[in-house]
């Protein structure tokens, strides 16, 4: 059977069942999702060739995934730098930021220019917006989305490429074009428009009964892998 691509309503419903029926905490799922993102990045962009990563984090759970991924990437030998233009004032996100600070992961307060990004980084991790995003992009994030639209650096997007509609995908020809898309839990409808080189599924935590209920038809993760190539 074919892999299912979720619409926005289905993606929200699956998340809510994980929280309410299966009693996962946000912390649990965020840690597993961010760890799987770090593993997918490591498979596609080894630290030997792409050591310096600009991790762009948004205000919601997608941004939290990015903070987790940054921490794990640092442990894997990368040098991540975090750009977090609108930090979330909740204990979970404050703790994730604190963990990164305690690991001496640098952050930048201003969005790099296209030129400075090309000089200072080898890869951008796009963890701005998740499946709850509805256009247009808010003012705080316009500069970083424009950076990703204009840069020649490879981009790895977490779940949804920033600025894309979760169901319709790209809204304009100049939208972000990631080289790696890491779909989490299950791919969303917008992933059908993905034309980059690498598409991975991460978030190896979906209970079999939930997979069957939504007919997700997820691929089998090989061995003890945390992500699987689609």
Curated annotation (Swiss-Prot):
(6S)-NADPHX binds at residues 61-65, 130-136, 159. The keyword Nucleotide-binding applies. Binds 1 potassium ion per subunit. One of its GO terms (biological process) is metabolite repair. K(+) binds at residues 62, 126, 162. Keywords: Isomerase, Metal-binding, NAD, NADP, Nucleotide-binding, Potassium. The keyword NADP applies. Disulfide bonds: none annotated. Its EC number is 5.1.99.6. It comes from the Eukaryota. Residues 11-218 form the YjeF N-terminal domain. It is an enzyme of class 5 (isomerase). One of its GO terms (cellular component) is cytosol. InterPro entries: YjeF_N_dom, YjeF_N_dom_sf, YJEFN_prot_NAXE-like. PANTHER family: NAD(P)H-HYDRATE EPIMERASE. Catalyzes the epimerization of the S- and R-forms of NAD(P)HX, a damaged form of NAD(P)H that is a result of enzymatic or heat-dependent hydration. This is a prerequisite for the S-specific NAD(P)H-hydrate dehydratase to allow the repair of both epimers of NAD(P)HX. HAMAP family: NADHX_epimerase. This is NAD(P)H-hydrate epimerase. It comes from Drosophila melanogaster (Fruit fly). The lineage of its organism: Eukaryota, Metazoa, Ecdysozoa, Arthropoda, Hexapoda.
